[in-house]
């Protein structure tokens, strides 16, 4: 099989919130692509041997000379280029055109009118105007606009406020679009990107789950040989897919460590051990470390401190087990492509602000002295799920809602106690069970219960109760960067509330969180 990454499409990132979305759209076409900073060096670029380049949008303005520019040599590379929003503007300025800040800004939907014929947009339309012009509904997000074309370019589309909403130099296969084809609001956006990537760049469309698995297995076997690999198995999607992939590639050379922190979902430990140990035959070392974690968390209420303690304690437990295994040479991790991109961005961005520390960042201690194996580091989350299904993992496991690494520790808004964890575990399980029963689970992106450290008066029979409050949270999102609270049916919420209050000892009241992101985050801590 040919190397799937032999001639990738490159996306040069100017800081757009949509850059990863561009890459995901390209991958959906079966095309391998990678994201690099806009100032990629020439030698690295040549080694990658790309089939074409997309210049992303960004928050800066090209009217300031100090702001980011594409490498000038890029425009002499003879490769097809597509500039989106800021990418189009910097292309225009660097090739001799002009861009000015506009008082007529465009944010949101706009009607786009196509001009004549262009290879990029021909025969792509939402409807036709009275004069026969093709019209598209697109998503705009810009203040600056191109006011003068570079030499050799022509206008290929316009909006009411942007006479040059798209430009093309067909002879050099250079294109610019002021709108965002990568977002779903641009109805024909995927077709436009496909026209550039597949038809103009002639990109290979072999990036499929089957081929990804074949190439990953070959690479794992080549790297590892006959040596043994250690994996921390959590039961989450990423580590589960890594376990299944490694098991197929190297069989009994894989050893997994599963740490029960006492902060997992109801019956989660049993499910993981049954699925991977008994059914798949993977060697798993199970460690019940509940007491160790609860002792470490005693008296701690600060969310950030809880995260750090849970991460540190996990490393201690994992390290202790790893030291007992003398013949292990490799450590496998479930790093995925967004982790790689975000780590690179944070390392070069002095202005980055840590909202919450990530439990995976920092890794395991150097004393392990193991070589690192990251077999899914080039995959987005949706690709990880597709690979998981192809490897035979159950749909319910692969499409399970996200669960934070610190587990219930950051869903208990107080000191973490066993009593609180047991209450929350049962309440959460009822909520998830009823979502499945009502066929709502896969219609929302994430749902969970939160334990609130306040007591509320309730009435049971003839007696009064003074017990804890549970809050339910359900959100809908595409990328988890923003989210809407789910408008679940009132009768459904009433049923869940009734079950929790009646079946979970210690709960007298259930509430529902109707906060979006922003301003709230999805998790409470």
From Swiss-Prot:
Transmembrane found in the keyword field: no
Binding residue positions for ATP: 234-240
Residues of the Glutamine amidotransferase type-1 domain: 8-206
Active site residues of this protein: 85, 180, 182
Domain GMPS ATP-PPase, residue spans: 207-400
CDD domains: GATase1_GMP_Synthase (cd01742), GMP_synthase_C (cd01997)
Transmembrane segments: none
Top-tier EC class: ligase
GO cellular component: cytosol
Role description: Catalyzes the synthesis of GMP from XMP.
Name of this chain's protein: GMP synthase [glutamine-hydrolyzing]
Organism: Legionella pneumophila (strain Lens)
């Amino acid at each position: 099989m040919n190397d799937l990454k032999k001639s990738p499409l490159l996306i040069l990132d100017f800081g757009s919130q949509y850059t990863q979305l561009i890459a995901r759209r390209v991958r959906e076409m079966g095309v391998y692509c990678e994201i690099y900073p806009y100032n990629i060096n020439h030698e690295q670029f040549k080694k990658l041997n790309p089939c074409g380049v997309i210049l992303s949008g960004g928050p800066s303005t090209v009217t300031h000379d100090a702001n980011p520019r594409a490498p000038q040599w890029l425009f002499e590379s003879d490769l097809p280029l597509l500039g989106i929003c800021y990418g189009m503007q910097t292309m225009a300025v660097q090739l001799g055109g002009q861009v000015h800040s506009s008082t007529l800004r465009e944010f949101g939907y706009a009607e786009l009118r196509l001009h004549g014929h262009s290879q990029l947009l021909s025969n792509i339309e939402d409807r036709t105007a009275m004069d026969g012009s093709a019209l598209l509904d697109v998503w705009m997000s810009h203040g600056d606009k191109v006011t003068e074309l570079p030499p050799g370019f022509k206008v290929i589309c316009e909006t009411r406020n942007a006479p040059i909403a798209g430009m093309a130099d067909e002879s050099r296969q250079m294109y610019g679009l002021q709108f965002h084809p990568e977002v779903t609001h641009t109805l024909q956006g995927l077709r436009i990107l496909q026209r550039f990537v597949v038809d103009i760049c002639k990109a290979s469309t072999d990036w499929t789950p089957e081929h990804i698995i074949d190439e990953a297995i070959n690479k794992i076997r080549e790297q590892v040989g006959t040596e043994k690999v250690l994996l921390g198995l959590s039961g989450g999607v990423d580590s589960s897919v890594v376990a299944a992939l490694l098991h197929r590639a190297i069989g009994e050379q894989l050893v997994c460590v599963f740490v029960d922190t006492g902060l997992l979902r109801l019956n989660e430990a049993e499910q993981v051990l049954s699925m991977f140990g008994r059914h798949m035959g993977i060697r798993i070392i199970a460690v019940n470390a509940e007491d160790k974690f609860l002792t470490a968390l005693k008296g701690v209420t600060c969310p950030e401190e809880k995260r750090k303690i849970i991460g540190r304690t996990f490393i201690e437990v994992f390290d202790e087990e790893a030291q007992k295994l003398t013949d292990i040479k490799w450590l496998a991790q479930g790093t995925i492509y967004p982790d790689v991109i975000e780590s690179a961005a944070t390392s070069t961005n002095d202005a980055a602000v840590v909202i919450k520390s990530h439990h995976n960042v920092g890794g395991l201690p150097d004393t392990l002295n193991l070589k690192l194996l990251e077999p899914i580091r080039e995959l987005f989350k949706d690709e990880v799920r597709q690979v998981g299904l192809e490897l035979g993992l159950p749909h319910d496991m692969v499409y399970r809602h996200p669960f934070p690494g610190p587990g219930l520790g950051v869903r208990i808004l107080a000191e973490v106690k066993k009593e609180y964890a047991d209450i929350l575990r049962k309440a959460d399980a009822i909520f998830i069970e009823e979502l499945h029963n009502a066929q709502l689970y896969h219609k929302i992106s994430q749902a969970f219960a939160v334990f609130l450290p306040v007591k509320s008066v309730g009435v049971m029979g003839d007696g009064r109760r003074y017990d804890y409050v549970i809050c339910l949270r359900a959100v809908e999102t595409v990328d988890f960067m923003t989210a809407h609270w789910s408008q679940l049916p009132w009768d459904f919420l009433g049923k869940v509330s009734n079950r929790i209050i009646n079946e979970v000892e210690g709960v007298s009241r259930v509430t529902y969180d109707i906060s979006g992101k922003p301003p709230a985050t999805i998790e409470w801590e």
